[in-house]
A protein has these predicted regions:
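NTP-dependent small-molecule kinase module
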Residues: 97-188
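Conserved nucleotide-binding/hydrolysis micro-motifs of P-loop NTPases
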Residues: 35-37, 87-92, 142-144
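Hydrophobic/aromatic beta-strand patches that form the interior of the parallel beta-sheet core
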Residues: 29-31, 81-83, 136-138
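Generic structural signal for well-ordered alpha-helical scaffold segments
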Residues: 17, 21, 64-68, 124-127, ...
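A glycine- and Lys/Arg-enriched "phosphate-lid" helix/loop adjacent to the NTP-binding pocket
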Residues: 41-121
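Conserved catalytic network of the ASCE P-loop NTPase/AAA+ motor domain
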Residues: 21-24, 72-77, 128
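Conserved nucleotide-sensing/catalytic segment adjacent to the nucleotide-binding pocket
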Residues: 1-31, 39, 45, 49-51
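Short coil/turn segments at beta-strand junctions that form active-site/ligand-binding loops
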Residues: 25-28, 77-79, 133-134
Length: 188
């Protein structure tokens, strides 16, 4: 086992709990990571032998306790909408390389390729079992919303449409945002 795996995951869990409490004080906040998916990393660490079953059980107990406290710590218990960007291994490796963080690079540590592949599997399982709120899946293999404005607009349309469906965005606000976004863009 790795003596730091459990401590690091508890640290991240605590940070995510603080972030979600703050975000849930107001409407329409976006977090790039959520407390709801945090257990993926601890479970992976446990399955790969970096953390013990006892640490996994302590972690789960702590997470469950935090989730039970969330309604009292924030005005809502769960997000209105969860956005899941689904990518395959090839896309993930491309984006990791492009991001350029040395400690994430497969060229520096070839074992990371297996780690990323396993992470994708764990996320797929998590997505299939997520029930805390509405879930919108974005095809990250098709949409490069960071670099392509047309893709970004299509993704925003999908997210904002889902926000209308769950009642966090009015249809008139959706139409106004969409109109503003496509202002000056020629339709083909």
């Amino acid at each position: 086992t790795n003596p730091y795996a459990f401590l690091l995951q508890v640290y991240f869990l605590n940070r995510r709990f603080a972030m979600i409490k703050k975000a849930m004080q107001e409407d329409n906040n976006i977090l790039d990571r959520s407390i709801y998916e945090d257990s993926i990393f601890m479970k992976m660490n446990t399955d790969q032998g970096h953390a013990t079953e006892e640490e996994w059980n302590i972690y789960k107990s702590l997470l469950d306790n935090m989730l039970e406290e969330l309604p009292y710590a924030a005005k809502k218990k769960s997000p209105d909408l969860m956005i899941f960007v689904d990518v395959n291994l090839e896309t993930m490796l491309y984006r990791v390389k492009k991001r350029g963080r040395p400690f994430e690079q497969v060229d520096e540590d070839p074992s990371l390729k297996e780690y990323y592949s396993t992470l994708i599997d764990y996320y797929a399982d998590w997505k299939d079992n997520y029930k805390s709120s509405a879930l919108v899946t974005i095809d990250g293999n098709h949409f490069d919303f960071a670099e392509n404005k047309d893709h970004r607009n299509q993704v925003l349309d999908k997210i904002e449409s889902a926000m209308v469906e769950v009642g966090t965005l009015s249809q008139s606000d959706f139409d106004r945002l969409r109109s503003k976004r496509y202002e000056g863009v020629q339709a083909f």
